[in-house]
Amino acid sequence: MRYRYNEVNLHTHSYYCRHGKGEIVDYVNVAKAKGLLKVLGFSEHAPLPDRTLDYGTRMAYSELDDYERDVKRADGRGGIKVLLGAECDWIEDEAGYYRDELLGERGY
């Protein structure tokens, strides 16, 4: 399916990354009310398993399951496709985690 550029937002942060506000469903409800978006992608700052580089802007590793659940529950609400993603800083020592867990096991 093709969308116009203004029908898609793939860089959205909720309260999970500490500098966003509101729950995922809140963003979907606002998008529906405004009637502009067809696709809304969440890209919370990816947690690191050992909490390195945690400056208060990442979700906690323990929140990954809740984050995934909230995105999946919101998908399709109001006719909006909701996508699960993560904003990752490239850290060479974490390449295996990004590849195996976020991309592989969790399917980001």
PLM region spans:
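Active-site-proximal loop/helix segment associated with metal-binding centers of metalloenzymes
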Residues: Y108
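An N-terminally biased module of ancient metal coordination in phosphate/nucleic-acid-related enzymes
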Residues: M1-E92, Y97, L103
